[in-house]
Regions:
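Glycine-rich, flexible loop/turn motifs
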Residues: 54-55, 102, 165
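A short beta-strand-turn-helix
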Residues: 50-66
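Structural alpha/beta surface segment adjacent to cysteine/selenocysteine redox centers
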Residues: 64, 69-156, 191, 215
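C-terminal cap of thioredoxin/glutaredoxin-like
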Residues: 1-35, 71, 84-90, 153-220
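Hydrophobic single-pass membrane-insertion segments
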Residues: 36-46
């Protein structure tokens, strides 16, 4: 074999070794990536399996043609005022089963807001979300603080079983749910409370504006 041929053979061998090393490195990287993805997915599955799945707080038929969503905070002064004006009840009287109301938490007004939202969720486990919601708005001052005495007062007033209610709160069962609720509200365009959506569109929370939007959707 000539020197030229030997040089070419050596270059070819070196090139093959380089490709083999590169291929081996690429395979290792691929295995690491697959492992990371599998680990990530297993972590996500663990979270989703342990996360609390809470049913919606719905007042009205789930299949109503007009769906009204309220993003609100139990410490919110404007939410309390809207509730006590009776607009919801007036709309329900006017439109009946053609509308449904859904309450969604957006607890961002005070430091106590997330705790109130968690307490409402714990009350919902006993099918007492709406009585809890109504009691807070109708009996406490705006921006109420949350403490054991107030929670015991509500429990006695609306018929909550104290032990499971207190256990639910102590366990922090709805911590993640409340955090997710805030993100959901923001993704739906909520920037303050209350924020109302009628079939996905924000509407001013007056009786006139809301009834006009409903009539438009119903074609009446």
């Amino acid at each position: 074999m000539s020197r030229k041929e030997q040089k070419k053979a050596a270059q070819t061998k070196a090139s093959r070794m380089k490709m083999a090393r590169f291929g081996g490195l690429a395979l290792i990287i691929l295995i690491v990536i697959i492992g990371l993805i599998a680990w990530s997915n297993s972590g996500e599955s663990a979270v989703s399996e342990t996360a609390v799945l809470a049913p919606p707080h719905l007042d009205g038929p789930a299949d109503a043609p007009v769906k009204i969503i309220e993003y609100a905070d139990l410490t919110c002064s404007s939410c309390r005022q809207w509730h006590n004006m009776g607009i919801k009840e007036q709309l329900q009287a006017d439109f009946g089963d053609q509308i449904s109301f859904e309450y969604r938490h957006f607890p961002v007004i005070t430091a106590a807001s997330p705790r109130w939202a968690e307490a409402a969720q714990c009350a919902a486990e006993q099918d007492l979300f709406w009585p809890f919601h109504d009691y807070v708005y109708e009996n406490f001052e705006p921006y109420p603080t949350v403490n054991d005495a107030r929670l015991q007062e509500i429990a006695a007033a609306i018929g909550l079983e104290s032990e499971p209610f207190e256990s639910c709160l102590a366990a922090g069962r709805y911590d993640k749910f409340i955090g997710d609720a805030i993100q959901r509200a923001q993704s739906d365009g909520a920037r303050g409370t209350p924020t109302f959506l009628i079939n996905g569109q924000q509407v001013f929370p007056s009786y006139e504006a809301m009834s006009a939007a409903i009539n438009l959707l119903l074609g009446s």
